[in-house]
Amino acid sequence: MALKASPDDQKLLLDLQALDTKLAQLDHRAKSLPQHAVLSALDAELMTLRAAALERRGAREDVALELKRLESDVEVVEARIKRDTERLEGSSSVKDVAALEQELTALRKRRDDLEEIELTVMERLEEAEASLAVATENMAGIDERRAAVEAERDASLAEVASERTHTAANRQTIASKVPADLLALYTKQRDRYGIGASLLQYGVSSANGVKLLENEMQTIRATAPDDVIICPSSDAILVRTNESGL
């Protein structure tokens, strides 16, 4: 037996469909906010900067370790120079004095060479620290920009959520007025085909903009106003009004 519903109840489906369409649009808007793409780009940039910072931090640590080894080598040489100087001052043996002076000359040259290398490494360390500082500053800039974009996104999402809550409440009000069997059919068609109700306006189905054939219009004209009919082109419940062209 065909489903029956008063024309007024059927017209409620158009309001329900409009609200469902708006809810879908709000969900799409929430997923399509421009901030989402900006945040993804910033995250990718931040990942690149973090990798660069990690590499530069490792390079700085390597140079710092090299400098520490050089400083240790200089300390060892300084200690040997001090020891040999003390031995030289206390020695009366010509042979020992000659040997100590020769060793001191070699040690002083070694110390000078190490200190020269040390200066070069210190310059490299300064460069490495400056490079790391730039990477760190760049990351801080991205973090700051990201926080600002997140705030914009959250504000937009809150606005959408508020509008969605209001729309959902309106939908609930309309749905409560629709007979249960008619609402069940509407829900079934909407879940299956994407649209639950379509307005027939001057022979055109609003669900897809398709003009119905004359034989289809003749069939519709032959149905009672309280007959619930399915649109032959969109499979939505076809709602008839004074503007349907019947």
Language model segments and positions:
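Coiled-coil termination/hinge junctions
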Residues: 146-210
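Short coil/loop "hinge" linkers that interrupt or connect long alpha-helical coiled-coils or helical hairpins
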Residues: 69-106, 190-215, 226, 230-235
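Short, non-ligating residues that shape and space the ligands of small metal-coordination modules
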Residues: 214-218, 240-241
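Short metal-binding segments enriched for Cys and/or His
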Residues: 236-246
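Long amphipathic alpha-helical coiled-coil segments
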Residues: 69-80, 114-139, 185
